[in-house]
Amino acid sequence: IYPALAIREILARRFTFSSGYVGVSGGMEEKIVSREADIAFMGVRAQGMPRTVSKDWLTFPFRNAAGIYDAFRHLKQFKPDLAVTTGGFVAFPVLAAARILGIPAVIHEQNAAMGVTNRIFAGSAAKVLLTYASAAQEDGKKTAKPDLTP
């Protein structure tokens, strides 16, 4: 949440734009982002991929399919020129909907190892920004170390 808000703050110093934040409805994102008066919060249904065999495997595909629909609807209405994500399971429906709608995506990976969602969408992203070189994918075609220090 905070890396995305920091990226937005840095971009806002250089450009004028409207921004929205897509996060899990009722989740931590909604509580934090709702305090920001100039950011539209758009809720989606999403669920992280279960790491062990459990009943969550039954709901996982359906909740994320619903999340793609939610994100598709929000992005179609908001009409962004760019989708910027910072990973996590909520990025999956956003990146999937952005790909369907032809909206370029920039992925920012702030961890030393790239997460599952970022690995899945790195190949189709317009750019992948890394904090650590160790997070680069083997092909290394779409990665760059960002300089986002204010």
Regions found by a protein language model. Name each.
Residues 12-63, 145-149:
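Conserved nucleotide-sugar phosphate-binding/catalytic loop shared by glycosyltransferases and other
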